[in-house]
A protein has these predicted regions:
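Conserved beta-strand elements of the Class I
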Residues: 112-113, 232, 308-309
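Cofactor-cradling patches in redox/metallo enzymes
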Residues: 128, 135-202, 240, 247-251, ...
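Short cysteine clusters
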Residues: 11-19, 23, 52-58, 62, ...
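Catalytic cores of enzyme domains
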Residues: 207-215, 221-243, 256-259, 263, ...
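Active-site glycine- and acidic-residue-rich loops that bind
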Residues: 119-124, 238-256
Length: 349
C-alpha cells in the first residue's frame, strides 16, 4: 500500500505555519494553525477538514515540502468528512472508470504529449509548436485509460487515486515513453509531485506543458512577432503542485511580447476559479464562489488586461464566459503562443 511521506516533526519545528496561515479561504493565526495541522496529523477532527475548499494552495505554501494538502485529503477520507456532496463524489468515481475496451498501444520510443482526459481538445495542440511530437490519448472513447486520477483530491478520495493510478502509469509506460509532456497541470502534478509523495514509481520523466512551449518557442524565436497584448493568467489549483514550473508563465509572456498586468491576485496570491467551491453545495457556497470569481475578474479588469490566459480546461469552462462578459478575451496559453508565431489559433474565441 502506498503511504504518504509526511513528517510530523517538520510541522512541530515550522516557524511560519504558512500552509494554513496563508490560506485565502480560512482565517487562522499561526498558533491555531499549528494546533489544527497537528490534530489533522493525529487523525483528529478539525474545522480545517470541514472548511477546506480543496484549492491545493497549501502544498505550495508549505516551506517544508511536507504535503499538507495530501495529508488533509487523506484525513478527510479517513474521518468521512467529504468536501463535496456524496452523490457528486460517487458520480465522479464512476465517471473515471475506463470503458470501451483497451486502448491501442503504439510504440513511441521517446518523447510524447499526453492529452489525458482532454482528447476533445486536440485543436489546442496543432501547428509548428507541436510538429513531430507524438500524442497519446487522442480517442475520447479510450481517454480514461490515461486519466491521472488526481481530480479525486477534490473528492477526498486518495484511496481511489492509489488504487487506479498504477494501472494508468503502466498503460502509458507500454508506449515506451521516456519523456511525457503533460497537456494538463494536473497530470504533471500527479507524476512530479503526488507519485513521489506516496512512493509510487514513475518510469518516465514528466515535462510541464509550459516548459515545453517555452523551449519550443526558443527554437522558433526568429518567427516570433510580439503579440503586444496585456494579459492576466488564471492560475489553476493543480499549478500549486508544481510551483517551480510557474516561472515559465512570465518567461513565455516575455518571449512573445505579452505584458503581464500588475494584479493583486497573482502568482502565490492567485485565486482559484471557484468551481469546486460552488460544487461543495454548502450553505453560502454559491455566494462564496461568486464573490471569489467577482474579485478575480474585477482584478483583471482593473489591471487593464485585454486577455485572460488559461491552462486548465476546468478553469476555462468555469470562468471563460464570465471573463468574456467583462470584455476580456479568454484564451489558452498554447493558442496565445501560436498567435505569436503567425498562426491562427483554432481555439481563439
Amino acid at each position: 500500500m502506498y503511504e504518504l511521506k509526511y513528517d510530523e516533526q517538520k510541522c512541530l519545528s515550522c516557524k511560519t505555519q504558512a500552509c494554513l496561515v496563508k490560506c485565502q479561504y480560512i482565517d487562522i493565526d499561526k498558533e491555531s494553525a499549528k494546533r489544527e495541522i497537528l490534530k489533522i496529523a493525529h487523525g483528529e477532527d478539525s474545522f480545517v477538514l470541514r472548511d477546506c475548499v480543496t484549492c491545493y494552495a497549501c502544498e505550495e505554501y508549505c516551506p517544508c515540502n511536507n504535503h499538507p494538502y495530501y495529508l488533509i485529503v487523506e484525513k478527510q477520507e479517513a474521518l468521512d468528512i467529504p468536501p463535496l456532496p456524496r452523490p457528486i463524489i460517487q458520480r465522479g468515481i464512476n465517471m473515471g472508470i475506463p470503458f470501451r475496451g483497451e486502448p491501442q498501444i503504439e510504440q513511441i520510443n521517446g518523447k510524447a504529449l499526453l492529452m489525458g482526459v482532454f482528447s476533445d481538445l486536440m485543436f489546442l495542440i496543432q501547428g509548428r509548436l507541436f510538429e513531430g511530437l507524438p500524442v497519446i490519448s487522442t480517442d475520447p472513447r479510450k481517454m480514461f485509460h490515461y486519466f491521472c486520477q488526481l481530480m479525486y483530491l477534490h473528492f477526498a478520495r486518495s484511496s481511489i487515486i492509489k488504487e487506479r493510478l498504477p494501472k494508468i502509469i503502466k498503460t502509458i509506460a507500454e508506449h515506451d515513453v521516456t519523456e511525457l509532456v503533460c497537456f494538463h497541470d494536473e497530470c504533471y502534478g500527479t507524476y512530479a509531485s503526488y507519485c513521489p509523495s506516496v512512493g509510487m514509481e514513475v518510469p518516465f520523466t514528466p515535462i510541464h506543458l509550459f516548459e515545453y512551449l517555452y523551449n519550443r518557442l526558443l527554437e522558433l524565436k526568429n518567427e516570433i512577432k510580439p503579440v503586444k497584448l496585456k494579459v492576466a493568467y488564471q492560475r489553476p489549483c493543480s499549478s500549486r503542485l508544481s510551483p517551480d514550473k510557474h516561472r515559465f508563465v512570465q518567461a513565455i509572456f516575455d518571449l512573445i511580447g505579452a505584458e503581464a498586468v500588475k494584479r493583486e491576485y497573482v502568482d502565490e496570491n492567485a485565486l482559484c476559479c471557484g468551481g469546486t467551491i460552488q460544487g461543495q453545495r454548502r450553505e453560502g457556497s454559491r455566494k462564496r464562489a461568486a464573490d471569489v470569481q467577482r474579485r478575480n475578474i474585477e482584478d483583471m479588469k482593473n489591471a487593464g488586461a485585454d486577455v485572460c490566459v488559461f491552462n486548465c480546461p476546468a478553469c476555462y469552462s468555469t470562468l471563460g464566459k464570465m471573463v468574456a462578459g467583462s470584455g476580456i478575451k479568454p484564451v489558452f496559453m498554447s493558442d496565445l503562443c501560436r498567435l505569436a508565431i503567425g498562426e491562427s489559433p483554432a481555439g481563439w474565441r
